[in-house]
Design a protein with these regions (language model features):
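Amphipathic alpha-helical interaction surfaces
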Residues: 26-33, 78-81, 104, 108, ...
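Surface-exposed interaction/gating patches
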Residues: 53-101, 105
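Long, charged all-alpha helical bundle/coiled-coil segments in cytosolic proteins
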Residues: 1-51
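Long amphipathic all-alpha helical oligomerization modules
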Residues: 84-137
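Non-transmembrane, amphipathic alpha-helical segments
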Residues: 4-15, 56-64, 83-90, 110-117
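Generic detector of ordered, mature protein regions
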Residues: 34-43, 72, 77-78, 82, ...
Length: 137
């Protein structure tokens, strides 16, 4: 019974973890830092204190992959904004990162039987990548 309870708990956390991956990855790109692995470090306030401490969360494979795919969608908005601000250099760098992310996710999911909704999300990400390419001309 313990194994099934853990699987149900994982299903509950996947959406939250996915949002964390998307946000942390987007922030990393915008601040020109490295996109984190499944183990994400962050700072948090110690309860009952003003002091901060570093902590980590390790997200599931599913959450990581879906979060990266969602990040690709957000990066198109970054490209659009950068282009409007005439920062074509950054827009092109972000486009390169989008392509790398897509290729990485494609490699991670090529032989996966567990990622149920991956095909539609991959199609959306491919379309987003294509739209960003057109945007950059």
């Amino acid at each position: 019974a313990g194994k099934y309870r853990k699987r149900d708990l994982n299903r509950l956390f996947v959406d939250s973890e996915q949002e964390i991956v998307e946000a942390v990855s987007l922030f990393a790109v915008i601040t020109r830092k490295r996109i984190p692995s499944r183990e994400i470090s962050f700072r948090t306030q110690i309860p009952g204190s003003y002091d901060m401490k570093y902590d980590k969360i390790k997200v599931s494979d599913d959450a990581y992959v879906y979060g990266l795919l969602d990040c690709i969608g957000e990066l198109q908005a970054v490209i659009s904004r950068s282009k409007r601000q005439n920062d074509l250099d950054f827009a092109n760098k972000v486009f390169g990162i989008m392509g790398e992310l897509f290729n990485e996710v494609e490699t991670l999911t090529e032989f996966s039987n567990t990622l149920k909704k991956i095909k539609p999300k991959m199609d959306v990400a491919a379309g987003t990548l294509n739209n960003a390419r057109k945007l950059l001309g």
